């Protein structure tokens, strides 16, 4: 496992933990799952992909991005890296795309 993969795994685990233990927003706490994290080579930026059980993912995406500084603060307390990357949260739509493909395949039967 490369160093970058280890950093991504560490951030994944810690952000998921922050969502459960430190965030008061129940929509985020109960309905959001981190699916993937991609960190830039210089560790200055990280894109955090998430899914949600709710249909209002745009609202949740805005709420999470509004909490970026809080999440970064807690990361700095728990993760020992030279630099904590700037975070950008993006809804992971692969599940929705998969559902659409399944519906199309069902119509072909």
Report residues per predicted region.
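Charge-rich, low-complexity N-terminal segments
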Residues: 1-45, 51-109
